[in-house]
Amino acid sequence: MTRTDLEVASDFVHGWVASPKQRRARLGRTLPVAAVQVAALSHPDLAIRRSCLFLLDHYASDASSDIFRRALRDPVASVRESALHGLVCERCRHEDICVTEVVTDVIEILAFDPNPEVRHKAVAALARLIGRDGRAGEAIARAAHHDSDAAIRLTAQIVADSGQPHVRSRKAALRDVRRAARSRSS
């Protein structure tokens, strides 16, 4: 009986999660990449999709850029966050990312993703790419004026004003917006 890619990937994810941390790196080298790529896009369990994206980011990120890009359209926000991270993270890659393609994708996420958490992470990703593609700064400046979420507007404005690649957490941005609203009403 032949096992499907979804079964192979699911079994691998469960085995990886159950393994001691010191064994995971060795297990990661045996990653069934094709099966995990299929599962990252089509497994019915969102936890498996997220885990597959995590594994691809850490063990096969260079070969999985298209998978990350396609997973940006997942209906679940936390899966899109994982896909966004996999697309922009350079730490686990051996090859350089294609900045032009990545910035194009992240600008689209910032402009159109319905989830403010995902858009906040898009601001953070673009902030790290400002010096490598001018469109990143332009998109952040647009978000500072036009995003529907006040915390994203504030975060984007801070990045646009400072040019710093570091973005505070969404929780901190929400706190700053509430604090500013209280001080205006006082």
Predicted stretch roles:
Residues L6, S10, R50-S51, E81-H85, ...:
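Alpha-solenoid HEAT/ARM repeat scaffold
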